[in-house]
């Protein structure tokens, strides 16, 4: 039996391994783990053995028959070649002589060893002692294989792999237990320099709408790329890069591509995660090679998508590798604009024809100054501060949530579909607050699907109740559908159907119900359709809101003509619950066309230290990115309660953060604040000073005239619900039961009276009931109680004396 005796514990193992090998003639090397798996599948008694222990036995059996896995032989050959470079030829010859003297039967193997050790039978000559010394060095090299791998990252150069053609007669089928042994391909080190190459961008500024202000800022930052000589006269280093941030889907990557396309400069683009590797030191090497590639192709623009994935804050990084990657990015950015290495003076001297001598030096901005790095991220606060300092990503360009005008411009760029005559882009822009470019693109795509379904149902499925068809009817409809699909593709056949295949306004309305805008994905609410016409009464409060928020946006020129500061103001709406404070805030945002962020007080509270403050910063940052914007804090008393002396709890920290954001060093710019509360007496006094919440408006209980207006607006002038001919709003408003009713109570009154009218029509089979009558309102008024008790009404009357609007006293004559 070749290789020695069998296994005492399992004499049949070695013959079975040999039998398995004979199944694959021509195969030279086998993997022990694959052979062990095949044997366990063939022989049930091996399935009960531990796979790791059994694999060791199979490995020993393969070693006995001198068939070691190719990976192990490759390692030995690699080690031998490495040592050949440093050892003398006589020592290697002595080792070969010594190996020839050693018999093959003298190999001693173990279950853990990957290669057998040889037994020395010759005398100890000088050459043999040198050979043994060489073996010790090889063993030492084995134990230090991890360090050798890292060393190769910095010493070996990646060479393009050359495909080798294999003759057909030499191609053999790979058995399950055979080693594939593919040629070693270069890993991620060479991937950046070999596969990432500059390319042209076909996106230009004209393809992006609503970002003219940002484009103007980019042109100032990229001046050195198009006019390097002009910029060099300033004698300052050019900008190395900037960060583009905004909510997901706002067009950050497309914006960066448009910069390269408009300036006609090649770009290098890749996701930041493509640089991440599991081998220590490889990620840093990829970054270095990427920046070297950018320098070699200067001028160019380097785009790193989602840069926060590889550049998190170092103080919160969980692994040391993340800190090293951030440090490497900082170093690579610094090296973009560095003076070149000093050359010998003789290489810098030039002699003219007239005998003059001049010193020619390279421009310090010649190598990497033509590289502009653009990083995109949805979380700028998550990027390490070292990258955001001056000299690196010192500029940040915000692409916030577009306003109504910007949305209309975006729709003009992306809407290439066939629209019906009743559709205008201005209408769609007004119905899509909180939508970014990707959301608008999805809306158009969804509206097209709705139009296709509508036309399809009209042409093919004539029956409107096709969802309740029987099995035979479904089969018949399916045959009709297939016949239409397999017919001639003639679009003119649809011209008779409502003017052809067009997207109507109704299609957009149906599509709006299925698309979730970016503002809602971020946790912020939007206001689609609340206007002053939907709000009854509250005339004085509406006037104050218009002068504080509406006119500074719509009549900014008049403010400037009189020299009035147009700074954003804050309003605190207080009063009993249900009087329309939230509706007022929504209507203000809708009338101005501004973005609207609704924040309920408890939503920002978090049990973890620092998370509540971070949520406040996020809200204000989103508002600044989407300015002009209105932030509405509902139940603001839960956010900013009064602080006691010396308090240092989480609530106090949250109040401090909110105070800083409201009136900090940076300012709010065009961010308006509206707060609503039922308890202004427990709100911290620092919030109520001018500059934060400038005015306090008390929203009182509606009077009789106010109740008439609320009833008329809530019923859409008697159309929703349908009202009877005997309805008199003044009579209803004067009912004694309605004393102390709020606007929400009146809405509940209308709903209850509608249900009573429906019950009379359905349960009593009284088809003469065509709408809600006076008797239904009277019965509903007797059932509903006011939401604010008498004791609470007295408290709000006292609050009105403190915070209510003071009436101007007439001048004395």
UniProtKB/Swiss-Prot annotation:
InterPro entries to which the protein is assigned, alphabetical: AAA+_ATPase, AAA_ATPase_domain, AAA_lid_3, ATPase_AAA_core, ATPase_AAA_CS, NLV2_N_sf, NVL2_nucleolin-bd, P-loop_NTPase
Residues binding ATP, per UniProt: 246-253, 575-582
Disruption phenotype: RNAi-mediated knockdown causes an arrest at the L2-L3 larval stages with few adults reaching adulthood. Abnormal presence of vacuoles in the intestine with some intestinal sections almost completely degraded. RNAi-mediated knockdown in a ced-3 (n718) or ced-4 (n1416) mutant background causes a similar arrest at the L2-L3 larval stages.
PANTHER family in the cross-refs: AAA-FAMILY ATPASE (PTHR23077), NUCLEAR VALOSIN-CONTAINING PROTEIN-LIKE (PTHR23077:SF171)
Protein's job: Probably together with ced-9, plays a modest role in preventing ced-4 and caspase ced-3-mediated apoptosis.
GO terms, biological process: apoptotic process; lipid storage; negative regulation of apoptotic process; negative regulation of execution phase of apoptosis; positive regulation of nematode larval development; ribosome biogenesis
UniProt-recorded name of the protein: Protein mac-1
Pfam families: AAA, AAA_lid_3, Nucleolin_bd
Region of interest: Disordered: 97-131, 152-193
Keyword set, alphabetical order: Apoptosis, ATP-binding, Coiled coil, Nucleotide-binding
Molecular function in Gene Ontology: ATP binding; ATP hydrolysis activity; preribosome binding
Coiled-coil regions listed: 58-89, 122-152
Annotated Gene Ontology cellular component terms: caspase complex; nucleus
Assembly notes: Found in a complex composed of ced-3, ced-4 and mac-1 or of ced-9, ced-4 and mac-1. Within the complex, interacts with ced-4.
Biased composition (Low complexity): 175-191
Record field: compositional bias (Polar residues): 158-172
Taxonomic source organism: Caenorhabditis elegans
Stored SUPFAM superfamilies: P-loop containing nucleoside triphosphate hydrolases (SSF52540)
Similarity-based family: Belongs to the AAA ATPase family.
């Amino acid at each position: 039996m070749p290789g020695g005796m069998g296994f005492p514990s399992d004499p049949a193992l070695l013959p079975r391994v040999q039998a398995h090998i004979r199944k694959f003639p021509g195969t030279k090397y086998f993997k022990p783990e694959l052979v062990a798996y095949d044997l366990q599948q063939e022989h049930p008694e091996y399935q009960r053995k531990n796979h790791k222990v059994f694999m060791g036995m199979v490995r020993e059996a393969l070693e006995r028959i001198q068939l070691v896995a190719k990976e192990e032989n490759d390692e030995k050959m690699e080690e031998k070649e490495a040592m050949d470079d440093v050892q003398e030829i006589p020592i290697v010859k002595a080792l070969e002589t010594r190996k020839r003297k050693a018999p093959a039967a003298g190999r001693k193997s173990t279950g853990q060893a990957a290669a057998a050790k040889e037994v020395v039978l010759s005398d100890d000559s000088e050459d043999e002692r040198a050979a043994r010394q060489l073996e010790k060095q090889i063993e030492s090299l084995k134990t230090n294989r991890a360090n050798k791998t890292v060393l190769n990252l910095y010493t070996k150069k990646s060479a393009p792999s050359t495909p080798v053609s294999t003759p057909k007669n030499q191609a053999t089928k790979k058995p399950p237990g055979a080693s594939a042994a593919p040629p070693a391909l270069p890993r991620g080190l060479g991937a950046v320099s070999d596969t990432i190459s500059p390319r042209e961008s076909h996106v230009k500024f004209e393809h992006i709408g609503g970002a003219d202000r940002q484009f103007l800022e980019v042109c100032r930052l990229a001046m050195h790329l198009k006019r390097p000589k002009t910029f060099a006269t300033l004698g300052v280093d050019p900008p190395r890069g900037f960060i583009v941030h905004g909510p997901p889907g706002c067009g950050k990557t497309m914006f960066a591509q448009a910069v390269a396309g408009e300036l006609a400069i090649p770009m290098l683009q890749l996701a930041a995660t493509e640089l991440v590797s599991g081998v220590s030191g490889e990620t840093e090497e990829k970054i270095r090679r990427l920046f070297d590639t950018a320098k070699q192709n200067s001028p160019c623009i380097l785009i790193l998508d989602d840069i926060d994935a590889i550049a998190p804050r170092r103080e919160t990084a969980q692994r040391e590798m993340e800190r090293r990657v951030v440090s490497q990015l900082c170093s690579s950015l610094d090296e973009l604009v560095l003076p070149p290495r000093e050359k010998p003076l003789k290489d810098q001297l030039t002699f003219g024809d007239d005998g003059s001598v001049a010193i020619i030096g390279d421009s310090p901005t010649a190598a990497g100054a033509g590289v502009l790095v653009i990083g995109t991220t949805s979380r700028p606060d998550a990027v390490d501060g070292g990258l955001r300092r001056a000299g690196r990503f010192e500029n940040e360009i915000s692409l916030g949530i577009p306003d109504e005008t910007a949305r209309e411009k975006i729709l003009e760029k992306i809407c290439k579909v066939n629209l019906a005559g009743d559709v205008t882009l201005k209408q769609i822009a007004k119905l899509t607050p909180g939508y970014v470019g990707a959301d608008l693109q999805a809306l158009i795509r969804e509206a097209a699907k709705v139009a296709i379904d509508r036309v399809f149902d009209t042409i093919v499925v004539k029956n409107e109740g096709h969802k309740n068809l029987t099995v035979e009817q479904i089969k018949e409809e399916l045959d009709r559908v297939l016949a239409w699909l397999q017919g001639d593709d003639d679009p003119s056949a649809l011209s008779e159907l409502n003017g052809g295949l067009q997207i109507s306004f109704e299609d957009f309305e149906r599509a709006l119900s299925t698309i979730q805008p970016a503002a809602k994905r971020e946790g912020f609410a939007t206001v689609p359709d609340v206007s002053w016409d939907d709000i009854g009464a509250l005339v004085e409060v509406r006037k104050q809101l218009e002068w504080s928020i509406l006119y500074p946006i719509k009549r900014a020129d008049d403010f400037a003509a009189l020299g009035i500061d147009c700074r954003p103001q804050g309003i605190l709406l207080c009063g009993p619950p249900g009087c329309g404070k939230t509706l007022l805030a929504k209507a203000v945002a809708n009338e101005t066309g501004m973005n609207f962020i609704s924040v309920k007080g408890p939503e920002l509270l978090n049990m973890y230290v620092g998370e509540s403050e971070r949520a406040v910063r996020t809200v204000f940052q989103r508002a600044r990115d989407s300015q002009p914007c209105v932030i509405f804090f509902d139940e603001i008393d839960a956010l900013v309660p009064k602080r006691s002396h010396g308090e240092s709890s989480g609530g106090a920290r949250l109040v401090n953060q909110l105070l800083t954001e409201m009136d900090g060093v940076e300012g709010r710019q065009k961010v308006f604040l509206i707060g609503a509360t039922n308890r202004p007496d427990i709100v911290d006094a620092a919030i109520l000073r001018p500059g934060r919440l400038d005015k306090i408006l008390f929203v009182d209980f509606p009077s009789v005239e106010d109740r008439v207006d609320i009833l008329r607006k809530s019923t859409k002038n008697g159309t929703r619900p349908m009202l009877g001919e005997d309805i008199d709003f003044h009579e209803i408003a004067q009912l004694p039961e309605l004393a102390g009713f709020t606007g929400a109570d009146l809405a509940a009154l209308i709903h209850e009276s509608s249900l009573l009218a429906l019950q009379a029509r359905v349960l009593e089979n009284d088809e003469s009931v065509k709408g809600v009558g006076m008797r239904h309102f009277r019965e509903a008024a007797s059932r509903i109680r006011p939401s604010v008790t008498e004791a609470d009404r007295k408290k709000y009357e006292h609050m009105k004396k403190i915070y209510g609007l003071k009436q101007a006293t007439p001048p004395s004559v």
